[in-house]
């Protein structure tokens, strides 16, 4: 009996060592993957931005700028990326919006970091400080306001996923923002905070989005109403998170096309 107990303990220790070794290998793999992914960032960003905007309180802000035809002055939209960082899909939507008569700036709020790897995307979204984002967006907003073809009183901020939440935060920070667009972004449901919003709000959400439940969206709408903020909140049936993926998907119709058309209508009426 004593020998059996000793054998069992040895087996437990052996299993423990194997598990620790596996965990150690996973940690090494994750760290190595992040390092390799980070080394590729600069080339990715250079391929996605076409303008560097001076920032008096930090490094220059890389951005994709899309211009409409005509002299203007045009309304303008600051379009903030998802938690991946800058992506061709965001540039495609920015270019399509410019065709509708808007000057569009899609800034890189991660300061030259971008990824297609979910763990790193989550890390970037969680560790990029709101104060830093607001500083960079200030540089973009002020640059837009001085452009000869932009109406400085008609500058909107909007975004997708991470960018939707940052749009809401920035609108609470900058009283000059004319309107706010949130495509399935993080929400604030305190009416006292939302009273500071300087303009109308559009919210686009999916009914099956597990990260932003319908109940939270409804609480957000109620809080906006209590705060006296003009708003248009729509929950699309059968749609999950990040369902407005690309301009190709938008042009194909369905929920993506409907949500985009709702956005365009909101712009034409409110901006």
Indicate where each model-derived feature is located.
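N-terminal Sec-pathway targeting helices
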Residues: 4-25
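Serine-hydrolase catalytic machinery in alpha/beta-hydrolase-like enzymes
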Residues: 14, 43-45, 50-149, 245-247
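Alpha/beta-hydrolase
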Residues: 80, 107, 183, 236-239
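Short alpha-helix in the alpha/beta-hydrolase fold that links the catalytic acid
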Residues: 93, 213-223
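Acidic catalytic loop of the alpha/beta-hydrolase fold
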Residues: 208-212
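C-terminal catalytic histidine-bearing segment of alpha/beta-hydrolase fold enzymes
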Residues: 227-271
């Amino acid at each position: 009996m004593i020998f059996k107990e000793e054998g069992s303990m040895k087996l437990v220790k052996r299993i423990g060592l194997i598990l620790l070794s596996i965990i150690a290998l996973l940690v090494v793999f994750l760290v190595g993957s992040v390092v390799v992914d980070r080394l590729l960032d600069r080339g990715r960003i250079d391929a996605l931005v076409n303008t560097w905007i001076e920032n008096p309180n930090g490094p220059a802000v890389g951005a994709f700028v899309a211009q409409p035809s005509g002299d203007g002055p045009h309304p303008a939209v600051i379009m903030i990326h998802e938690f991946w960082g800058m992506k061709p899909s965001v540039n495609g939507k920015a270019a399509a919006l410019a065709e509708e008569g808007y000057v569009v700036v899609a800034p890189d709020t991660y300061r030259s970091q971008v990824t297609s790897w979910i763990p790193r995307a989550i890390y970037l979204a969680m560790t990029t400080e709101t104060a830093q984002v607001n500083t960079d967006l200030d540089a973009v907003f002020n640059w837009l306001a001085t452009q000869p073809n932009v109406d400085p009183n008609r500058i909107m901020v909007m975004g997708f996923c991470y960018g939707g939440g940052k749009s809401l935060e920035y609108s609470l920070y900058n009283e000059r923002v004319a309107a706010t667009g949130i495509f399935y972004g993080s929400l604030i449901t305190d009416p006292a905070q939302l009273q500071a919003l300087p303009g109308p709000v559009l919210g686009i959400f999916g009914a099956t989005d597990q990260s932003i439940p319908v109940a939270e969206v409804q609480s957000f709408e109620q809080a906006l109403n209590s705060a006296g903020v003009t708003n248009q909140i729509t929950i699309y049936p059968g749609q999950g998170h990040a369902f407005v993926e690309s301009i190709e998907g938008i042009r194909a119709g369905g929920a993506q096309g409907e949500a985009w058309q709702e956005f365009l209508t909101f712009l034409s009426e409110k901006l």
